[in-house]
Regions:
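Aromatic/hydrophobic pocket-lining residues that form the small-molecule binding cavity
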Residues: 1, 23, 27, 67
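Radical SAM/AdoMet-radical enzyme domain recognition
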Residues: 1-16
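Active-site-proximal beta-alpha loop/turn segments in soluble metabolic enzymes
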Residues: 12-20, 50-56
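Active-site glycine- and acidic-residue-rich loops that bind
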Residues: 16-31, 89-97
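Auxiliary Fe-S-binding modules of radical SAM enzymes
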Residues: 35-154
Length: 154
């Protein structure tokens, strides 16, 4: 890890929150490690089961509340870190690109959104999460407007 930082590369580390069997102590340890590593980016998402994976049988979704709390804690502990706002909302059909969930994450302290540029035909074949939804820059512009944030991109 030190070599990565010394080379000038940015270091990212994040969490999948509330996967089956995960404890609050483990989440706390992860947060402290992220601070110790002085990361520049923290992708934090709730657990979403995906079909045909070992944890699929355990089903369920990770807690949005726990995920939003982790985002808020990270923002307080590391004001300069970039935190993603890719959060599901109440409708699982929207996957990680949900307006309600994204806005809650931005309000909790997240400051980054992804533009998923994967073509729809490929997205259906790439099943890291079920119901993957690809939304581009229009979604990001909408989210920034709803959150009262200014977009900075090149």
């Amino acid at each position: 890890m030190e070599w990565i930082k010394q080379s000038g590369m940015l270091l990212a580390s994040g969490n999948i929150v509330d996967y089956p069997g995960q404890t609050l102590d483990e989440l706390a340890e992860d947060i402290l490690l992220m601070k110790e590593l002085e990361i520049s980016w923290a992708p934090v998402i709730p657990y979403l089961s995906a079909a045909n994976t070992p944890l699929a049988a355990e089903g369920g979704r990770g807690s949005q509340e726990k995920t939003l709390r982790e985002i808020a804690i990270l923002r307080l502990m590391m004001p300069e870190v970039n935190i993603t706002a890719q959060q599901p909302g109440e409708n699982p059909e929207n996957g990680l690109a949900d307006t309600e969930g994204n806005l809650k994450a931005l309000n909790a302290g997240a400051n980054m959104l992804f533009a998923d540029m994967l073509p729809d035909a490929l997205a259906k074949s790439f099943s890291v999460v079920d119901n993957r939804t690809t939304l581009g820059l229009d979604h990001i512009k909408k989210m920034a407007d709803l959150a009262g944030m200014q977009l900075l991109y090149k």
